[in-house]
Amino acid sequence: MNDSFKTKTTLSAGGATVSFFSVETLAKEHPEVRTLPYSLKVLLENLLRHEDGRVVKREDVLALAKWDPKAEPDKEIAFHPARVLMQDFTGVPAVVDLAAMREAIVAMGGDPARVNPLSPADLVIDHSV
């Protein structure tokens, strides 16, 4: 991780210390961040946390920090969810796809453990089976 904006900080509470990336610290240099909708601040924190100079670049953070709701979007940004929550209607086909890919890897003599989601995923079954 790059942390080119120097936003990584710590918080101590209850005897534990955690690290996080402060959107408020970024706002000191880029005050327009304070006017972003909350949902975009969450996305901005995600970019700060994953800035690596390759997939998430400094320019990506600045593009979102300077977001103008009236402007036509001209840049895609990366999003790295901490986890994915899937309802059974969409989750079951994804699990079936993963199983099929693992079977295909085994049939080709490969290691099925190489086929895994990049983000943790939870499958919620919202009815009785």
Where are these regions (language model features)?
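Fe-S-dependent hydro-lyases/dehydratases of central metabolism
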Residues: M1-V129
